[in-house]
Swiss-Prot record:
Database matches in Pfam families: MINDY_DUB
Presence of keyword Zinc-finger: no
Gene Ontology CC annotations of this record: cell periphery; cytoplasm; endoplasmic reticulum
Coiled-coil stretches noted in the UniProt entry, renumbered to this chain: none
Active site location: C28, H216
Protein's name in the database: Ubiquitin carboxyl-terminal hydrolase MIY1
Protein family: Belongs to the MINDY deubiquitinase family. FAM63 subfamily.
Source organism per UniProt: Saccharomyces cerevisiae (strain ATCC 204508 / S288c) (Baker's yeast)
Catalysed conversion reaction: Thiol-dependent hydrolysis of ester, thioester, amide, peptide and isopeptide bonds formed by the C-terminal Gly of ubiquitin (a 76-residue protein attached to proteins as an intracellular targeting signal)
Superkingdom field: Eukaryota
One GO BP annotation of this record: cellular response to pheromone
EC number from the UniProt entry: 3.4.19.12
Classification via PANTHER family: NF-E2 INDUCIBLE PROTEIN, UBIQUITIN CARBOXYL-TERMINAL HYDROLASE
Length: 360
């Protein structure tokens, strides 16, 4: 059976529209892109066919949607036929899942998947950004990491701490891993206060874009210096007054629902069950996302503890070495006695290091 999308009638600033709602795949990139093409005045001149399709009924099939988007892409592009064919072959992945890698300076790794959005002249943004002004020496460097490169550094640091691998820049890897782990631990919703501020400043008024967050894609709109995401959860299908959700806080605690004209919306308890999941609230992340966040927290905690233990051991050894040097000056020790004691200490230290290594 072909997958389909349910449509919903909304009125935005006095104009009637039909938008697409989420199906079982959740807030996918295909949905966010299609709704921008439907709503954005900058794109509607190319999307008449899509608007007609959505207005046709209460549901449209995934196959029909992809075919119409392919037709639109052929209209707007000036790329050679070979290039456009390769990009169009990626269209189904907008629904299935994309390889999107956010970088902690606010950009993305330049992948083929990102080229699809450029093809439709639609911006993709995120707010998972490190504030490089707090500690310029550390955070400026960390801001050039992406999510995937951060994961590689965390794994590499774990291997170093367990003695599995060692190289000349091990200290640098361990330092970066500790700070990256703390950053991931402090931003489990993949949005930071600094990143949210940057989005408000960067995005243009009355313009649409796609917000990437927690592997989800949302239709984002800036209206009068405030950010709003289009509400596409199927649970709100019958809530005509709920069109937008403000993006005011990192954890969703200050976010609110708004009508199509951006006035406060009233939630009817009979229409909407209180346990409906909100798209990006920390308490409503998908199960696998919660597990990933907990894994990141645990890894960050272990790395921090291991780094502290390493520093403590180094300081202890330095003090012992300093004490021995002073003892040698004031009370010389016989060579054979010193050798036996040194051998015993080295053996004990070796046994202790082996017992403390935990394979992660």
């Amino acid at each position: 059976m072909d997958l389909s999308f349910t449509t919903k009638s909304v009125k935005i600033n006095g104009q009637n529209h039909r938008i697409l709602l989420q199906n079982e795949n959740g807030p996918c990139a295909l949905l966010a892109l299609a709704n921008i093409l439907i709503l954005s005045p900058d794109h509607t001149r190319f999307s008449n066919e899509l608007i007609r399709l959505v207005n046709k009924g209460s549901q449209i099939s995934l196959k029909e949607l992809i075919e119409v988007l392919a037709d639109i892409a052929l209209q707007v592009t000036d790329k050679p036929s070979t290039d456009i064919s390769e990009l169009l072959s990626l269209l189904p992945r907008l629904h299935e899942g994309l390889n999107i890698n956010p970088e902690f300076n606010g950009s993305f790794e330049n992948t083929k998947e990102m080229s699809i959005f450029r093809l439709f002249n639609v911006d993709v943004v995120h707010g998972w950004v490190i504030n490089s002004f707090i500690n310029e020496n550390i955070d400026e460097k960390l801001s050039h990491y992406s999510y995937e490169s951060a994961q590689r550094i965390l794994t590499q640091a774990a291997d170093i701490n367990c003695g599995i691998s060692q190289d000349e820049n091990s200290d640098e890897v361990l330092r970066d891993a500790m700070h990256l782990g703390l950053f991931l631990n402090e931003s489990p919703t993949q949005l930071t206060a600094f990143g949210l501020l940057r989005l408000r400043e960067k995005l243009l008024h009355n313009k649409f874009s796609i917000l990437f967050r927690n592997d989800h894609f949302s239709t984002l709109f800036k209206y009068e210096d405030r950010l709003y995401t289009l509400v596409t959860d199927f649970g709100y299908k019958n809530c005509k007054d709920i069109v937008w959700q403000s993006l005011d806080s990192v954890d969703g605690s200050c976010d609110a629902f708004f009508a199509g004209n951006f006035s406060a919306a009233e939630v009817n308890g009979q229409q909407l069950s209180t346990d409906i999941e909100r798209d990006f609230g920390t308490g409503n992340l998908l199960l696998e996302e919660i597990q990933q966040i907990e894994n990141d927290k645990e890894l960050a905690k272990q790395l921090q503890e291991q780094e502290q233990e390493r520093v403590t051991k180094f300081e202890a050894k330095r003090k012992i070495h300093s004490h021995k040097k002073n003892s040698e000056i004031h009370a010389p020790v016989k060579k054979d006695k010193f050798k036996r004691r040194s051998s015993l200490l080295n053996a004990k230290a070796s046994e202790k290091e082996k017992s403390e290594c935990v394979v992660m």
